[in-house]
Amino acid sequence: LIITMQNYQKYFPTFDNKGNITNEFLVVTNKQDKKGFIKLGNERVIEARLSDAEFFWFKDKSQNLVKKVSKLKSMNYFKGLGTYFDKVQRMRKLGGMLSDELLISKEKVELSASVCKVDLVSELVGEFPELQGIMGGYFAEAQGFEKDVSLAISEQYLPIGSESKIPKKAYSIASVSYTHLRAHE
């Protein structure tokens, strides 16, 4: 909701006193709107954008993440380094080694590594690229993946800056490690 409002429509979302988003937003315009046409037009636009997002969400979350891994073979990662599928295979290998050191399930780490980039081929992330990684975690949760795996997928890009939160769970740490140790690729 917030990304759609702020990044795409340049609206200001509003929040209640508990910090929850409300069903209202603010728009700045240089014209008076005595008849409410500007308000109505903006409401229609945001409703259409959110309807698209909802459609993509329901479609994408129903598609098996493991079965979509092969689609990464068609996405180039970086010249000379192969596809995202190739990257995921390297991440699985490194994650497996880290799992031994962290004394955590190798299977869970390898599973999270295997599917962590699959949201890149989802329609929702295609429409809202800034949700990559985040949506992968939500898709995994919606499909019944264990919480550790979903969280590792969601937190794979953390930290995103010096003020950003950092992962604290072992599976997320392994996820961050295999993402950031190979970031120089």
Set out the residue ranges of the language-model regions.
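Histidine/acidic-rich helix-loop-helix segments that form or flank divalent-metal centers
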Residues: 10, 113, 141, 146-177
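Charge-biased, low-complexity intrinsically disordered regions
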Residues: 17, 34, 77-84, 102, ...
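Short coil/turn segments at secondary-structure boundaries
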Residues: 56-66, 83-88, 128, 151-154, ...
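Active-site flanking loop/helix segments enriched in acidic
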Residues: 27-30, 66-87, 117-124, 135-140, ...
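An active-site-proximal "capping" alpha-helix that borders the catalytic cofactor pocket
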Residues: 92-98, 132-141
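Conserved small/polar residues in nucleotide/adenosyl-binding loops
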Residues: 179-184
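Short alpha-helical scaffolding segments that buttress acidic/His motifs in well-ordered protein cores
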Residues: 26, 46, 72, 95, ...
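His/Asp/Glu-rich acidic catalytic environments and adjacent acidic regulatory segments
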Residues: 1-60
